[in-house]
């Protein structure tokens, strides 16, 4: 079809087109894959970038992606024998068949002129002729039923071991690490006979001339070897079309196509355990703990109990597994809601309601207005004339304008279920692929004279993800289901994302492991020295004295194991489960935030991936879709300028019309317009203006059943619908349409306008004209379009041009979409002469018909009289301008990536305050790579040359279209383009494809490695962008939920992004950072005292604390403070974080979790451990003698030292707490109370079991000792005194920015900003009056389609038949 992706032209004819098969996709000459598979392109690009290969980026612009030009007609496309084949291809005459399409009797079809070759076997005679339909045969199959059909249509399928690249490839796919969904391994069809397999003897593969195809040289292929598992790859010659039997469910079931089940869940029963364990042990800390647990099992080497590591590790994994299962259960619930949606499927001669999951390939379904399509469907018939229907693809490509699809004339009459049940035949469809806008198939129908083969193309394909609009119902046959639908083929498996904090955490863990190694080596060397130097003096310890190299090595190994286990808790095992729980609760807080709840459609925020919450506080780039994300998809006719006079639906008091210097300025309301239409000098202009709005369009009126009911307009463009509604509001109501006339009602009188010709809109012309014979008999040309093309076609006698231009500037400054309206009268002779030229152009055969039509249109579109201009508001979502302004204040760069045209995107940029009046627009809109490079280089040179003198980077905004972006994303130009884009405050990319959206995100991610990227969108076309970014946010609510279901967080409105980032993001980042640092601190403090003790116990490896007391340190005694800090701490209130968005930069700069901060916490922990151990040693020096004369002993001293350590780390938690709540009181002082109570119980019960005999009698002695209580509080105060002094000095003499805000919060200091903002708004209004904008957009959004075909097909004056069809569309006397 139209538009070829950038992949180069078709190469020379090849006799070996299909070389190999990998992952069920054909590979083409030269080993290059089809450029249409987004997944493969993204993976190839990522691999090339990582390997450093200098290859161009596979970028496909929006226009190339969907086809911007007119559809090209293939000369062979309408002939029988398969799509794209000529009739001669079905005979033995190959003279007319080019080499790429035919080799040795095989036919190939080039899918929609896009180089995506699909092999079509010419031995279709092996398939049984479908006689009558399955239902007409009484539910029986010819030849023995389904089993026989299955044997006859044997399919050479991949085995479980060979699909997806062998056993390991299959396992990777099942674990979600392969190239797509685990369910997306597609079966390959093979037309074979008699159960013959690939290469079996079912039938001969020779062509009709009896010449065998040339044999390929067999070469060894590791991919074929499969490591000894399964069988080799299937022969590519087995590829054939998908055969779908009409009204024959058993025959289709025998083919075992994938079902219509769609899953976005991360796990299933089989994959949960291996995938979960693989993900968990990709974390360095978990591998470390597993290794330590293994060392503890070595008898005689571990100084602690052998289960003190493995049990906490299992507990951590269990908690993580529970969290993962809960989150995956939510995904499964969302999938179940979709899979259990209701659809109407033909069963027998009636439509029965069933679940989407039960819809199968070959089913005939009925879809009604406003319903989404349950699968990929080929349109058979609709309620509209000529089999037309409107669909909305906003969830696929982001476009809100309706697309027109049309059924084949041969099937468009099948409007009743009984007619459909008698439909017999088969479809030969291309294999599933990811191209949204191409499709080739043939439909073979049973007719009275035999079979009739009809070509199918994208005009008949209705995709899953699209929605039926403005059409009561359609009938269609399902061709692709589930993960084989084009929507799901364009989706990618959700990647496992690692946060910046998590990566830094792994680095810190490695650092602590390094410290652990150093401590272990120091202790081991100390032990060896003590054994050698002091061995005789301490012979009573019976220590071995290694005297040989082997003995030394053995002792060294044993000591290293001992000390590794002893110091292993420097890495807190509870940290990771604590962080998991903290992040999980952050997700709950996001979900439960009523400020982000959208009550209009009962949609709360939903954090689907809580692992990423802290990165919400570190975002530097936001990539946003426009349609449905920034806007509401609702067009409203707001203002009009007619004959130099402005009219509006609502007129503010300060803008009401007044007379100044004899000139009327300001706005009139619509009431005044109706008065002027009757008795004002501008009445003729008003009449033609409103008549143009009511007639020059492609809108179809739909009347209600009741007489006098409100007319509903079916508009392919929301702009046109708004204009026609506006005309109706002003008294010119469009009522009916005939193929050659339109009818409007004015003042109760019906007027007929005879349609003579249509000059269609396209993106080059930027205008649309209709030629009517008006009710007064005069022929007039009505034209509407962009001001740039209308104004240059005006005659000299136009008195209102200047006033209209002024009004256009005002509309553009308000972000409204504008159109200019003009007309001219044409004599009968001039029209007849022109019409001959136009008819000749319309019948031109060849590729230049569109050009000839444009030339013919130019001949009559001149000397116009300007009637006025319209202003349409593409209403933004509530709060969008304020949100974008706040994000920019927070130093977040906002890039808008949209499929809309450049003018529309700029308009929206102005409306949402992404672009401001002070900004200088840098526009790149080139047609070649060289021109794009030259444009970018000149702009960069100009910026760098000016420096800080005349150009402020804050005033620059970049606007680039899809074609230029294609060139800019090439490898040799991408860095230069990114340098220019980074210099700009705002970037708008127009006419971009879904693939380009993802590539732009990948480009920024590649070069801005330290930046966090967030992508937000609402449609399926945004999924690849969402998954490419560090954080994906989906807009849920009005449209489909594909983006929301694939995102990490979903919200209902764009404005909620402000609180999500500035409040929840900032809180999460600060909380997670504080939780991690505190967890490291508390463990280092405790276990460094153990290290200092090794110098006292002659490096014997003895422990200072009882084993289970050590274990319970992280599990019970210090588990609550990190949770309180991580879940409840608020370093700044939500109100002030919103008021001062500049605070957000702290997360961008990673102020709370950089290496410097970690070192400070580490040194602080070491300092505390030294104070605690040294003073504890001094207090208990020589074993303190108790009141009863007994010596305290080793275990009593260790337990006494444990108390001040615990009190110190809990006191530190109190010092770093920003706001105290009752939960902080429970968590921090409460934890100390827990220890005092627990140690009393444990010290009493454990020795009695006996479980810990060394604790016998210790607790009574400790609790009765005043030295114990004095030491506990005195040492804690001594340690924390330095911390308190440092905190005081920091706030008083070197405060951070947030310290000032905390003071404002504490003392409730009033802010002057509200008054300042009011003053700034007043200044902006003054500037808007003083300055006129040059950028204006025009309000056409429909695709470049054939409007004439629509206008000349409808006759709304006819009544509908029994099934809602037009009575004129059914042959007379035909039954139902």
Swiss-Prot record:
Cytoplasmic topology ranges: 1-306, 531-559, 1129-1165, 1212-1224, 1279-1376
Extracellular side: 328-509, 581-1107, 1187-1190, 1246-1257
Alphabetic keyword roster: ATP-binding, Cell membrane, Glycoprotein, Golgi apparatus, Magnesium, Membrane, Metal-binding, Nucleotide-binding, Translocase, Transmembrane, Transmembrane helix
Positions with a binding annotation for ATP: 625-627, 720, 761, 763, 766, 784, 817-818, 898-900, 991, 997, 1021-1022
Needed cofactors: Mg(2+)
Gene Ontology CC terms: plasma membrane; trans-Golgi network membrane
Binding residues for a 1,2-diacyl-sn-glycero-3-phospho-(1D-myo-inositol 4-phosphate): 1212, 1282, 1286-1287, 1298-1299
Glycosylation sites: 339, 433, 490, 679, 762, 1083
Keyword Transmembrane annotated: yes
GO molecular function: ATP binding; ATP hydrolysis activity; magnesium ion binding; phosphatidylserine floppase activity
Site (Involved in the release of the transported lipid into the cytosolic leaflet): 573
Biased composition (Low complexity): 85-96
Biased composition (Polar residues): 97-115
Disulfide bonds listed in the record: none
Active-site residues per Swiss-Prot or TrEMBL entry: 625
Compartmental location: Cell membrane; Golgi apparatus, trans-Golgi network membrane
Disruption phenotype: Reduces the amount of toxins sulfacetamide (SFA) and fumonisin B1 (FB1) secreted from cells. Decreases cell population growth, conidia formation, conidial germination rate. Abolishes microsclerotia formation and severely disrupts melanin production. Decreases virulence in cotton and thale cress.
Composition-biased stretches (Basic and acidic residues): 40-50
Transmembrane segments: 307-327, 510-530, 560-580, 1108-1128, 1166-1186, 1191-1211, 1225-1245, 1258-1278
Renumbered residue ranges of the record's region Disordered: 1-151, 180-217
Binding-site residues, Mg(2+): 625, 627, 1018, 1022
Lipid bilayer topology: Multi-pass membrane protein
Matching Pfam families: Cation_ATPase, E1-E2_ATPase, PhoLip_ATPase_C, PhoLip_ATPase_N
Keyword Heme: no
Family stated for the protein in its record: Belongs to the cation transport ATPase (P-type) (TC 3.A.3) family. Type IV subfamily.
Protein name listed in UniProt: Phospholipid-transporting ATPase DRS2
Organism for this UniProt entry: Verticillium dahliae (strain VdLs.17 / ATCC MYA-4575 / FGSC 10137) (Verticillium wilt)
Name of the encoding gene: DRS2
């Amino acid at each position: 079809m139209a538009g070829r992706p950038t992949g180069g032209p078709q190469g020379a004819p090849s006799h070996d087109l299909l070389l190999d098969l990998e992952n069920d996709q054909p590979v083409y000459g030269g080993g290059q894959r089809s450029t249409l598979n987004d997944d493969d392109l993204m993976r190839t690009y990522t691999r090339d970038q990582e390997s450093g290969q200098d290859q161009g980026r596979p970028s496909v612009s929006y226009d190339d992606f969907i086809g911007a030009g007119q559809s090209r007609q293939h000369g062979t496309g309408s002939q029988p024998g398969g799509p794209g084949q000529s009739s001669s291809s079905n005979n033995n005459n190959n003279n007319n068949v080019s080499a790429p399409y035919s080799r040795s009797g095989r036919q190939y079809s080039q899918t929609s002129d896009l180089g995506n070759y699909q092999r079509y076997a010419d031995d279709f005679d092996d398939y049984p002729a479908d006689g009558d339909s399955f239902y007409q045969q009484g539910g029986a199959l010819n030849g023995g039923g389904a089993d026989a059909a299955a044997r006859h249509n044997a399919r050479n399928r991949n085995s479980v071991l060979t699909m997806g690249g062998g056993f390991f490839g299959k396992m990777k796919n099942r674990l979600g690490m392969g190239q797509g969904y685990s369910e997306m391994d597609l079966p390959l069809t093979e037309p074979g006979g008699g159960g013959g397999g690939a290469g079996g003897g079912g039938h001969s593969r020779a062509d009709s001339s009896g010449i065998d195809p040339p044999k390929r040289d067999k070469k060894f292929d590791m991919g074929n070897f499969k490591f000894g598992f399964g069988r080799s790859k299937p022969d590519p010659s087995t590829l054939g079309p998908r055969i779908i039997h009409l009204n024959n469910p058993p025959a289709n079931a025998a083919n075992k196509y994938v079902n219509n089940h769609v899953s976005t869940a991360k796990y299933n029963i089989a994959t949960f355990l291996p995938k979960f364990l693989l993900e968990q042990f990709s974390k360095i800390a978990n591998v470390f703990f597993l290794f330590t647990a293994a060392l503890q099992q070595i008898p005689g080497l571990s100084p602690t109990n052998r289960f003190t590591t493995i049990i906490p590790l299992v507990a951590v994994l269990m908690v993580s597994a529970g969290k993962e299962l809960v989150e995956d259960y939510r995904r499964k619930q969302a999938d179940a809601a979709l899979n259990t949606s209701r659809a109407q499927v033909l069963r027998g001669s009636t439509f029965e309601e069933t679940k989407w999951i039960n819809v199968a390939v070959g089913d005939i379904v009925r879809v009604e207005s406003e319903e989404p399509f349950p699968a990929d469907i080929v349109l058979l018939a609709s309620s509209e004339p000529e089999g037309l229907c409107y669909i909305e693809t906003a969830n696929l490509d982001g476009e809100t304008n309706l697309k027109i699809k049309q059924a084949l004339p041969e099937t468009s009459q099948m409007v009743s279920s009984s007619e459909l049940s008698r439909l017999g035949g088969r479809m030969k469809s291309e294999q599933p692929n990811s191209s949204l806008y191409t499709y080739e198939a043939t439909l073979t129908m049973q007719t009275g004279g035999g079979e009739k083969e009809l070509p199918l193309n994208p005009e008949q394909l209705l995709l899953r993800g699209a929605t039926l609009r403005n059409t009561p119902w359609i009938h269609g046959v399902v061709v692709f289901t589930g993960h084989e639908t084009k929507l799901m083929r364009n989706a990618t498996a959700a990647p496992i994302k690692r946060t910046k904090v998590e990566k830094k955490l792994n680095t810190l863990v490695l650092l602590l492991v390094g410290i652990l190694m150093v401590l272990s080596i120091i202790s081991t060397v100390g032990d060896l020295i003590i054994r050698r130097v002091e061995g005789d003096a301490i012979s009573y310890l019976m220590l071995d004295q290694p005297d040989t190299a082997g003995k030394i090595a053995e002792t060294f190994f044993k000591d290293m194991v001992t000390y590794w286990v002893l110091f292993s808790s420097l890495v807190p095992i509870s940290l990771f489960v604590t962080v998991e729980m903290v992040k999980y609760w952050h997700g709950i807080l996001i979900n439960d935030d009523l400020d982000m709840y959208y009550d209009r459609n009962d949609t709360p925020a939903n954090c689907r991936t809580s692992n990423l919450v802290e990165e919400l506080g570190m975002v530097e780039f936001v990539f946003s879709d426009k349609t449905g994300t920034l806007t509401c998809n609702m067009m409203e006719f707001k203002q009009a300028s007619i004959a130099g006079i402005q009219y509006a639906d609502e007129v503010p008091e300060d803008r009401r019309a007044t007379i100044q210097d004899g000139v009327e300025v300001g706005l009139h309301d619509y009431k005044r317009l109706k008065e002027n239409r009757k008795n004002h000098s501008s009445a003729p202009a008003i009449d033609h203006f409103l008549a143009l709005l009511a007639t020059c369009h492609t809108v179809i009126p739909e009347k209600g059943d009741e007489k006098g009911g409100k007319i509903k307009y079916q508009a392919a463009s929301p702009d046109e619908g708004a204009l026609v509604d506006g005309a109706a509001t002003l008294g010119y109501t469009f009522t009916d349409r005939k193929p050659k006339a339109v009818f409007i009602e004015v003042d109760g009188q019906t007027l007929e306008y005879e349609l003579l010709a249509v000059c269609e809109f396209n993106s080059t012309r930027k205008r649309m004209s209709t030629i009517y014979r008006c009710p007064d008999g005069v022929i007039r040309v009505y034209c509407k379009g962009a001001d740039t093309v209308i104004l240059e076609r005006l005659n000299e006698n136009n008195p209102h041009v200047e006033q209209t231009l002024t009004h256009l500037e005002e509309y553009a400054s308000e972000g409204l979409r504008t159109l200019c309206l003009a007309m001219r009268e044409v004599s009968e002779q001039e029209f007849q002469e022109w019409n001959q030229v136009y008819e000749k152009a319309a019948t031109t055969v060849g590729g230049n018909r569109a050009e000839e039509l444009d030339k013919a249109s130019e001949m009559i579109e001149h000397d116009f009289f300007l009637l006025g201009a319209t202003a349409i508001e593409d209403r933004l979502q509530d709060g969008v301008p304020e949100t974008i302004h706040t994000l920019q204040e927070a130093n977040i760069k906002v890039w808008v990536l949209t499929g809309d045209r450049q003018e529309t995107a700029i308009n929206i940029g102005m409306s949402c305050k992404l672009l401001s009046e002070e900004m200088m627009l840098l526009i790149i809109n080139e047609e070649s790579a060289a021109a794009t490079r030259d444009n970018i280089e000149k702009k960069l040179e100009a910026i760098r040359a000016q420096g800080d003198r005349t150009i402020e980077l804050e005033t620059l905004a970049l606007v680039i279209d899809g074609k230029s972006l294609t060139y800019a994303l090439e490898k040799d130009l991408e860095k230069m383009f990114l340098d220019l884009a980074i210099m700009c405050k705002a970037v708008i990319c127009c006419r971009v494809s879904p693939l380009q959206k993802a590539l732009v995100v990948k480009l920024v991610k590649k070069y801005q490695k330290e930046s966090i990227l967030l992508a937000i969108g609402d449609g399926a076309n945004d999924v690849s962008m969402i998954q490419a970014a560090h954080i994906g946010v989906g807009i849920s609510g009005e449209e489909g939920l594909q983006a929301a279901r694939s995102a990490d967080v979903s919200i209902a409105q764009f404005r909620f992004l402000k609180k999500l980032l500035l409040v929840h993001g900032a809180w999460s980042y600060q909380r997670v950072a504080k939780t991690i640092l505190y967890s490291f601190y508390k463990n280092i403090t405790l276990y460094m005292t153990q290290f200092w003790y090794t110098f006292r116990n002659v490096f014997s490896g003895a422990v200072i604390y009882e084993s289970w007391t050590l274990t319970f340190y992280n599990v019970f005694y210090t588990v609550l403070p990190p949770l309180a800090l991580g879940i409840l701490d608020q370093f700044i209130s939500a109100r002030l974080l919103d008021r001062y968005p500049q605070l957000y930069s702290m997360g961008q700069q990673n102020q709370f979790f950089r290496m410097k901060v970690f070192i400070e916490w580490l040194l602080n922990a070491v300092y505390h451990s030294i104070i605690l151990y040294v003073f504890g040693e001094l207090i208990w020096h020589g074993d303190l003698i108790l009141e009863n004369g007994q010596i305290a002993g080793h275990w009593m001293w260790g337990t006494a030292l444990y108390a001040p350590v615990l009190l110190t780390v809990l006191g530190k938690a109190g010092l770093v707490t920003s706001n105290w709540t009752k939960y902080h009181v429970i968590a921090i002082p409460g934890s100390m109370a827990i220890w005092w109570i627990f140690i009393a119980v444990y010290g009493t019960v454990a020795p009695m079991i006996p479980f810990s005999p060394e604790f016998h009698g210790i607790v009574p002695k400790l609790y009765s000792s005043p030295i114990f209580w004095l030491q506990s509080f005195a040492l804690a105060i001594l340690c924390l005194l330095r911390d308190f002094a440092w905190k005081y000095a920091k706030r008083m003499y070197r405060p951070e920015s947030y310290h000032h805000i905390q003071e404002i919060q504490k003392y409730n200091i009033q802010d002057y900003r509200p008054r300042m903002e009011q003053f700034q708004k007043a200044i902006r209004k003054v500037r808007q009056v003083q300055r006129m904008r040059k950028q204006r957009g025009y309000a056409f959004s429909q695709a470049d389609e054939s409007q004439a075909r629509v206008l000349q097909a409808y006759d709304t004056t006819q009544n509908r038949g029994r099934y809602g069809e037009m009575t004129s569309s059914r042959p007379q006397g035909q039954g139902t």
